[in-house]
Amino acid sequence: MHNPLSILLRPAALGYRVIVQLRNTLFDRQLLPAWKSPVPIVSIGNLSVGGTGKTPLVDWVVKYYLSIGCKPAIISRGYRRESKGVQLVSDGQKVLLSSSESGDETAMLAWNNPDAIVIVAKKRKEAVKYLVKHFAARMPSVIILDDAFQHRQIQRELNIAIINVSEPFLKARMLPEGRMREPLKNLSRADLIVLNKIDDPEKADAIVRKIKERGTPLIKARVAIAELVCFSGAFISSEEAPPLTSISALAFAGISSPQSFLDSLGKEGVTIAAHRFFYDHEPYSAKKLTEIFREAESKGLSLITTEKDYFRMLGHPELIRIITARPCYYLKIKTDIFEGKEILQSMLRKAVAMK
C-alpha cells in the first residue's frame, strides 16, 4: 500500500534526482572543476541522510592514522552549528570551540581525538586553504573530509562510502520522498564501500551481491558499545557507571535512528522504562530537559542518552545541570570492523603515500 505523502513527494524526488545527476555529469566530464589539495584527502560519506554510523568510522580512521604516526586533520561542515564561516575547533592541542559553535558530532570528534586538528566550514576548500596557511609549521599528513561523498569540489586520494545495512537500502527513494541523496549507481565513485550496522549477516547478502558486480572493495562492520559513561554531578567517568544490566532508565535522544539506540541498550540488558525522542540535531531547551528530568524523577529512573546528545548539551552547561541531579549516562559507541580491516588499513596507508 502506497503512502499518500510519498506519492505527493515523488515529483519533487524525480526533480531532485535529475539535478543531482546533472551535477555529477558535469563533474564527471570535468565541466565543473575539482580542486587539488596540497595535502592528501580521505573522504568519508554516504548516499543517504543520517544514521549510517559515519561519525564512529571517522573516529576509527583518525585513531588508526594516529597509531601509525600520521598527523590527521578533520574537516567537517559542522551541521547545525551556531558559528559561520571557517572555524578552528581544535588546533591539535586544545579544543577551542563549544559544541554549539562547532556542531555536536564535530565537537565529539575533537574531544575524542585531542591530537587532531579539527576545522568546520561549509566550503571545504576554504578550510583546506586555512589549514595550509595557519599550520605550515606542523602540516597534517592527511585531511579527513567528514560527510563529503557529495562534495565533489575537492579531489581525493580515497573516497569511502558507507551503507547502513539495517535499512531497506536497495528500495530506498530519493529526497524528499525518501532518505537517499543519490541513487545507488553512484556508488561507482567510491574506492571503498563499508557495509555498516551488520547485526544479521544474511541481511547484507542482497546488497553484497549487488555491489560485488562493480568490483569495489567491501568492508563489513557493525556498531558496538564501547562503554557507558556517567556524567552525573561534577564528574565524567566510565568507572562510575554500573553494569548495564542493573540500569532501569528513561532513554532520550535526538538522532536520525533512535530505534537503533534502543536496540543497542536492549541487547546489553538495559531496562528501558520510558523514552523521549527528538529529531536529529534538535537543540535542547530548558523546558524539554526539565520535563525529561521530572518524568525520570517521578518514576525513579536513571537517564541515558547518546554520546552525540551529551556533546550537544555540553555546549550549554546550564542544560546539563537540569538533569544531573539524577544518575545520568551516555552511551559511547565504536565501529567494529569484522571483515576487511586489513584492506581498509592498506588503502588508508596508500592514500597518504600518494603525495
From Swiss-Prot:
It comes from the Bacteria. Pathway: Glycolipid biosynthesis; lipid IV(A) biosynthesis; lipid IV(A) from (3R)-3-hydroxytetradecanoyl-[acyl-carrier-protein] and UDP-N-acetyl-alpha-D-glucosamine: step 6/6. It catalyses: a lipid A disaccharide + ATP = a lipid IVA + ADP + H(+). The keyword Transferase applies. One of its GO terms (cellular component) is plasma membrane. Transmembrane segments: none annotated. Keywords: ATP-binding, Kinase, Lipid A biosynthesis, Lipid biosynthesis, Lipid metabolism, Nucleotide-binding, Transferase. InterPro entries: LpxK, P-loop_NTPase. ATP binds at S48, V49, G50, G51, T52, G53, K54, T55. Pfam families: LpxK. One of its GO terms (biological process) is lipid A biosynthetic process. Its EC number is 2.7.1.130. NCBIfam families: lpxK. Belongs to the LpxK family. Transfers the gamma-phosphate of ATP to the 4'-position of a tetraacyldisaccharide 1-phosphate intermediate (termed DS-1-P) to form tetraacyldisaccharide 1,4'-bis-phosphate (lipid IVA). This is Tetraacyldisaccharide 4'-kinase. It comes from Pelodictyon phaeoclathratiforme (strain DSM 5477 / BU-1). The lineage of its organism: Bacteria, Pseudomonadati, Chlorobiota, Chlorobiia, Chlorobiales.
